[in-house]
Amino acid sequence: MKDRMGREIDYMRFSITDRCNLRCKYCMPDGIDCMPRWDVLALEEFEAIAIAAASLGIKKIKVTGGEPLARKSCPQLVKMLKNIPGIEKVTLTTNGVQLAQYLDQLLDAGLDAVNISLDTVDPVLYEKITGRDKLSEVMKVIEKAEDLPVPVKINAVSIDFRQLQTGTKTAGLSPQENWQQVAELAKRYPVDVRFIEMMPIGYGRQFKTIDHNWLLENMKKTYPDLAVDSTVHGFGPAVYYKASGFKGSIGLISAIHGKFCSSCNRVRLTSQGHVKSCLCYDEGTDLRSILREGQERPEEDTHYIWQAGRDVRDEKLQEKLREALARAIYEKPAAHCFEKPGEITEAHNMISIGG
């Protein structure tokens, strides 16, 4: 369906957990408490929302977290979403640490593509950023990308990480050195490497994003024959470039310095069941209250269990979900205001909103 600005909204991101096995400094550093288990949607609740979304024209769903594979039932959810009429693509964004373990299950479930979040290929810096020594686990999947039946993309946040490196043997690894090392993955493997400007939300406010105008200028100096790649790579806002000898492409997602709000096609669903139509604003439509109408929170914190015999396609339930979701989509803000920090009203961290 179209929002009030006439934009076609056909893409939804489902955050299925706020838990993660890494502790990235700009997202979920040590010391953050996870939300109560009961607050997180059950698989059937995601399914019910996806059915309503599909009836409104949502065709593509990205499963995210937190780290979605921290939820062992992630492959089951992918299969459930793929079986919904109208949902054409289901993809996954993961930090890649457990991807090799779950890859066969995800492919059997019908997963269409995978994005791996990876900000550096330097082992020491990786551990500084994430708090974990897990780079080798991530590289296992990237190194066999050529043999996979689905596209693989690498997402790297554009930050000057030197502020994390004081006292390490890689202290001073410059943005130029870091982005080039990551970009080389697209040369060695058939993967698209996308650099993403840091969203000034939550802990991300402490880190200054690298201007993608600077990055593109340096890319052109490093790869003189770099040219725009007009091939369709997905359904996101990245602008892609290709250099000779590269198996993959390099993409720039420039939310700050290349504002693309006029063509934004997405809304987000948090793991708590709130629809967010723009990352910049602390506004959301509560779908969980519709799904759990009349049910009381238990005294003990346990996972919410969908009631046996309750139909996710119940027409009254679906009507309420469609009405609330349609309102959230229609009222999507015209644009973010990330370039004006004083006007940003979103106070939550990305880990609780969803990547």
Tell me the role of every PLM-derived stretch.
Residues 40-63, 70-192:
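Radical SAM/AdoMet-radical enzyme domain recognition
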Residues 16, 20, 63, 92, ...:
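Conserved, mostly hydrophobic/aromatic
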Residues 4-43, 56:
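Canonical Radical SAM [4Fe-4S] cluster-binding loop centered on the CxxxCxxC motif
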Residues 32-36, 122-129, 202-206, 286-288:
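A short acidic, helix-capping loop that chelates divalent metal ions and anchors anionic groups
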Residues 22, 123-124, 259, 285:
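Glycine-centered loop/turn positions within well-structured domains
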Residues 1-11, 181, 187-188, 198-355:
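Auxiliary Fe-S-binding modules of radical SAM enzymes
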